[in-house]
Amino acid sequence: MADTAPLGTRTDGVEGGVGLTALLVAAARAIETHRPDALAQDIYAEHFVLGARASAHWPVRLDRAPGGDTSPLWGRFARYFGLRTRVLDDFLLRSVRSAGIRQVVLLGAGLDARAFRLDWLSDCVIFEIDRDGVLAFKHRVLDTLSAEPGARRVPIGTDLRADWAGALTATGFDATAPTAWLVEGLLFYLPHAAETALIDTVDRLSAPGSALAYEVKLEKDLMAYRDSPLYVSTRRQLGIDLLDLFSREPRPDSAARLRDRGWTASVHTPFDFTRRHGRGPLPEENDALAGNRWVFADRARPA
């Protein structure tokens, strides 16, 4: 596997805590990949799921999932992640092919295999930031597949609560060049101050022409949805209590913060993209997805 950087000695991998959610998303991407009407293709996802002890028994195809498409977990929630994958794939490819960006940063990259599965231009560079243990597991699986990235890939093993900006710039990131930033599924877990610090750092490192996509939850009371079928099924079937992992602090208005600093920002519900693509989750009663928002921001180039 090309372009791998040395990793540290941390052992915080995918077998527990927030790391398990990376396996959950990988399982969802695997299920999506095998759908006849798939929104996204990730041929690596099932190998991550089957390669970890904690998830080796999880389904990677819908016809092997209890309840199939009627399952809140393997049907609706997995399709949500499939839709999210497609929308954010499109964001990155549009940033590269239409906006001319050649530098991509994946914050909290998890088991994201976009460096390997998307059709990148050869002069792109993809920086992946996550904890050492997560990246070490990812590399072990990809190495067994002899996977090669489609562009230069720079994995950076560091905790996003540490000086990740320093680690990023030390590995060749160019703050004078436009960047496409992706923060997928990370901000749910960060306290208010940590989200604000991350957004401020992205703003500081972003040259004109940069773009940012991220996901947030806007519920004022997450625990009001504790009995949502989606959360209940994830807790009972996988032992993952998402609400125990999510930060319950009030969320900052990061989109407004970006606008105040000269960015344009649009805020969407996932259901907006369900309607656009003709498939995906739709609103329902006691909906754990009701507060989810996908935000897309751009820093304009000088006229």
Swiss-Prot record:
Per its record, what are the GO molecular function terms? Answer: methyltransferase activity
- Gene3D superfamilies the record matches: Vaccinia Virus protein VP39
Enzyme class, UniProt record, top EC level: transferase
The protein's Enzyme Commission number: 2.1.1.-
GO terms in the biological process aspect are: methylation
Superkingdom of this protein's organism: Bacteria
Keywords linked to the UniProt accession: Methyltransferase, S-adenosyl-L-methionine, Transferase
By its UniProt entry, which InterPro entries does this protein fall under? Answer: Ppm1/Ppm2/Tcmp, SAM-dependent_MTases_sf, SAM_mthyl_Trfase_ML2640-like
Where along the chain is S-adenosyl-L-methionine bound? D130, D159, L160
Q: Tell me, what does this protein do in biology?
A: Exhibits S-adenosyl-L-methionine-dependent methyltransferase activity.
- Give the protein family: Belongs to the UPF0677 family.
Could you identify this protein by its name?
Putative S-adenosyl-L-methionine-dependent methyltransferase SCO6443
Q: Which organism is it from?
A: Streptomyces coelicolor (strain ATCC BAA-471 / A3(2) / M145)
Query: What's the source species' lineage?
Result: Bacteria, Bacillati, Actinomycetota, Actinomycetes, Kitasatosporales
